[in-house]
Amino acid sequence: MSEKHPGPLVVEGKLSDAERMKLESNYLRGTIAEDLNDGLTGGFKGDNFLLIRFHGMYQQDDRDIRAERAAQKLEPRHAMLLRCRLPGGVITTTQWKAIDKFAAENTIYGSIRLTNRQTFQFHGILKKNVKPVHQMLHSVGLDALATANDMNRNVLCTSNPYESQLHAEAYEWAKKISEHLLPRTRAYAEIWLDQKKVATTDEEPILGQTYLPRKFKTTVVIPPQNDIDLHANDMNFVAIAENGKLVGFNLLVGGGLSIEHGNKKTYARTASEFGYLPLEHTLAVAEAVVTTQRDWGNRTDRKNAKTKYTLERVGVETFKAEVERRAGIKFEPIRPYEFTGRGDRIGWVKGIDDKWHLTLFIENGRILDYPGRPLKTGLLEIAKVHQGEFRITANQNLIVASVPEDQKARIEKLARDHGLMNAVTPQRENSMACVSFPTCPLAMAEAERFLPSFIDKVEGVMSKHGVSDEHIVTRVTGCPNGCGRAMLAEVGLVGKAPGRYNLHIGGNRNGTRIPRMYRENITESEILDSLDELVGRWAKEREAGEGFGDFTVRAGIIRPVLDPARDFWE
């Protein structure tokens, strides 16, 4: 779909200001260290506001009280979001106990937020606690390097596949890819860990002095599970196994979901198949994809800087040939693979070596002690006795992994006693939202705070039409940046203004089709009216086993998005 209008390999023109900022930052140092000592403001100033993102942080404020503070002639209540680097979402119980303690003692909100990129975030870190949080992470073998801005972000890996041995192999590759693509600058260690500056000059052999044109996301996915939503990502390694052993990967490049309202130069896009590669070429190919995007990505317009736009501009075959040239390989034909679902398997699943995995549903990934449901305390109590690890899933849930048979009852009792195993409907299990208000500065409409009650109402609609045992993959994202992955849902809501959303339908359960906008800028009641009509038709007219999204396409209710660069906005 990308060979119709081949364009220039490099976009000429005035570089965006972000490129100036990166070039002048001295390999991401800026004046962050000096800014830390400025007690006159709770935030970071100038370029540092953006540079801290390379160190895994975003500067935010509490939007619920922004107007009140302005009326009092006070600056916004600045606080940082910090996102940990956690390839594949695997975290030890020792590490969990440390982050639980920090969240309780040193953040405004006291919560841990699991994200759909398989890691955790702290919200509400005051400036005085910014350095301590990095030092706490380092003390337990973690960091926040490259979890935001123009780098390869946290690498995802299927959390709980049918073959646990395959997970172990795939997870090791997720870690290797993450480490290989990390920035080499010593700025992180110097600023946060007080390591001395050495005389040698920084070099970035892979990322370059101005790093990537835009954010870059990578996954390792094990079919038939598409839990990590590969089509939301720039670079995807689809595991191919023979006799239960990993032998290589299919490579898919150029997925991405973020758009800008009304900007028809932006669109969501599924990833393109490049071919199959044996394991020994994995790191060379990963580096080649990244460096090709580094050199060819649009540095004049950040709205058109992601890999998906580079592929559309130069053509898939041209990009693929350059990756082959740089990696010194020829891709083999894509090997067969299929996705049959992407939801987590809530409850107990038996793995290898007589070990068990317990997947706990965490609504919106928000871990906090709620009235009657002390989730945060419950996970801490499990961490105190569990000898295995936790795995954070790309559906914002948590797996208590590698539980011996003789410990199952003990772990389950702790989970039940703390409200971690309450019954959940299939519809709620298959719904997700980004954080949005009150902390996200980009939020246009509620998402996390809106979703629970909205799903109550959706369940009412489904009950009315006799399909309560079914589910519709439902996602809410507070703005068109798309962190809630609404652009791969069967029903996707994209925030437009307070209380108003664009309604997208026509995606599928497996996450391989982009949904199209069905109604624009509508209220919750209007959304529910539309769903009432559509679910009613689905209940009566669907074929055996037909999901809601597939039905809306087959019935002609919505046209499928086939070539996003040309038909996403039609």
Swiss-Prot record:
Lineage: superkingdom: Bacteria
Pathway(s) it belongs to: Sulfur metabolism; hydrogen sulfide biosynthesis; hydrogen sulfide from sulfite (NADPH route): step 1/1
One cellular component (GO) term of this entry: sulfite reductase complex (NADPH)
EC number(s) on file: 1.8.1.2
Catalytic reactions on record: hydrogen sulfide + 3 NADP(+) + 3 H2O = sulfite + 3 NADPH + 4 H(+)
Keywords: 4Fe-4S, Amino-acid biosynthesis, Cysteine biosynthesis, Heme, Iron, Iron-sulfur, Metal-binding, NADP, Oxidoreductase
One Gene Ontology term of the molecular function aspect: sulfite reductase (ferredoxin) activity
Cofactor(s) recorded in Swiss-Prot or TrEMBL: siroheme; [4Fe-4S] cluster
Positions with a binding annotation for [4Fe-4S] cluster: 434, 440, 479, 483
Family, per entry: Belongs to the nitrite and sulfite reductase 4Fe-4S domain family.
Function, in words: Component of the sulfite reductase complex that catalyzes the 6-electron reduction of sulfite to sulfide. This is one of several activities required for the biosynthesis of L-cysteine from sulfate.
Protein name listed in UniProt: Sulfite reductase [NADPH] hemoprotein beta-component
Organism encoding this protein: Klebsiella pneumoniae subsp. pneumoniae (strain ATCC 700721 / MGH 78578)
Gene: cysI
